[in-house]
Amino acid sequence: QGETILHNVPLISDIELMSEVLARLGATVVREGHTLRINTADVDSCETPYELVSKMRASISVLGPLIGRFGEARVAMPGGCQIGARKIDMHLVGLEALGVAFDVDHGVLAATTPNGLRGTHVYLEFPSVGATENMLMAAVTAEGHTAIENAACEPEIVDLADFLISMGARIENAG
């Protein structure tokens, strides 16, 4: 919660869509050139707007943070991928291991944490960047220790881990 300032943010449509998604969730998002100021103090919704998130692949990336903050989330299945259809199975398997229960109805993924998030050991069949990111963002709010085996090790994973650490998370061996 609070304000985050991101620099060197590219001027691309997915950033604009994600900014609108965050605003609809209750965040204040201000763009000044290549800088984004995001304040999430007033985020009060865990349901993403279908008409926006169904247009972009990155929509699944809000799942872990919303679950971590609210214990539940309703997110439209991802769309808008120029590469083609890609599965989100590893996201779901990893989050289920943390204690998330899922239901899919009419293209909307409903997630709940009946017993809260709990640390666990997860093995990813493939080192998916997106699944690793979602697991990290949810796991930092879980009770206990989480180990992600076969996690992605790209620079963006290291950057995310460093960012979460700067906000108080305890993460080791990222990347």
Locate predicted features.
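Structural preference for solvent-exposed beta-strand-turn elements
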Residues: 1-175
